[in-house]
């Protein structure tokens, strides 16, 4: 399991299962999953059946064949080339490039609350054609069952944020979008191609971006910030600082120290990944995947 996204269930939702809904998935999974709780410390209860199935996602549900005239998307190729280098010890537990291009799945939910229209919006990614993974959107009235839309929104690992009455997004590999006429338009690229999942936090004119990088040893949670007072085309990410690395056994610290690779990992490893930010009453929480993709943790985050 990986790619967490946490919300406090809004008041407009009736018959809520708990105070908090935590969304996540298997990296190559067949559904978006959800767990609910009344306390961030748990206990968490897994909702049976998930909240959106692959069949209902409008993504591919069967492995596609490679077109004769296939030309790989340049952006996604650079992202894969920058990070696909599995250690021999884990080669059997990481999808091959061909599997990455053909395995139907949906994952990496980004769930936000639209209070004005009283709905819950979820962005998610998966395979739309051979070798091409993209983000789409789904909507729900209760957060328990989502209706997906056909339109492609952007690249994978979408995170959405607001600044000065405009909506923006950030995705792999470092793409900044601005929502214009109801569409997310790419306006900048502020990272190298080795960035994986991210979490975002806006404070005044600063955008804090929490992320991890494929190939790091161990893969850890980093943070860079962006001065948004400038026009988006001039946004630039600061040098990263370390936020969190595996220190506990349940985070993977007792496992071999090896560089990470692009794509899923199907055994426990010495890595933390997939940061997400949740704020409640000015308290900032960092969610992240532990032992590679072998669990989800929550930590309090202090920003000086």
Which residues fall in each region the model found?
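Beta-rich carbohydrate-recognition and catalytic domains
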Residues: 1-108, 112-268, 279-304
């Amino acid at each position: 399991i990986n790619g967490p996204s946490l919300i406090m269930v809004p008041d407009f939702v009736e018959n809520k299962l708990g105070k908090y809904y935590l969304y996540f998935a298997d990296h190559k999974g067949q559904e978006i999953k959800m767990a609910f709780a009344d306390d961030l410390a748990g206990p968490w209860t897994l909702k049976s059946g998930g909240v959106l199935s692959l069949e209902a996602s409008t993504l591919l549900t069967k492995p596609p064949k490679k077109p004769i005239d296939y030309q790989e998307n340049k952006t996604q190729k650079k992202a894969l080339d920058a990070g696909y280098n599995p250690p021999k010890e884990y080669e059997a537990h990481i999808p091959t490039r061909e599997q990455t291009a053909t395995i139907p799945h949906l994952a990496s939910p980004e769930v936000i609350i639209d209070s004005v229209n009283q709905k819950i919006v979820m962005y998610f990614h998966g395979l739309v054609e051979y070798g091409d993974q993209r983000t789409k959107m789904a909507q729900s009235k209760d957060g328990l069952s989502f209706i997906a839309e056909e339109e492609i929104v952007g690249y994978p690992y979408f995170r959405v944020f607001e600044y000065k009455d405009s909506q923006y997004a950030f995705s792999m590999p470092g793409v900044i979008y601005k929502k214009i006429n109801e569409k997310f338009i790419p306006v900048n690229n502020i990272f190298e191609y080795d960035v994986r999942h991210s979490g975002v936090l806006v404070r005044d004119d600063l955008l804090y971006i929490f992320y991890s990088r494929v190939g790091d040893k161990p893969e850890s949670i980093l943070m860079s910030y962006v001065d948004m007072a400038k026009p988006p085309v001039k946004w630039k990410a600061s040098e990263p600082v370390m936020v969190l690395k595996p220190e506990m056994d349940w985070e993977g610290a007792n496992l071999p120290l090896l560089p990470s690779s692009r794509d899923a990992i199907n055994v426990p490893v010495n890595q933390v990944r997939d940061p997400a930010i949740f704020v409640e009453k000015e308290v900032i929480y960092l969610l992240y995947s532990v032992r590679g993709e072998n669990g989800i943790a929550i930590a309090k985050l202090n920003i000086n």
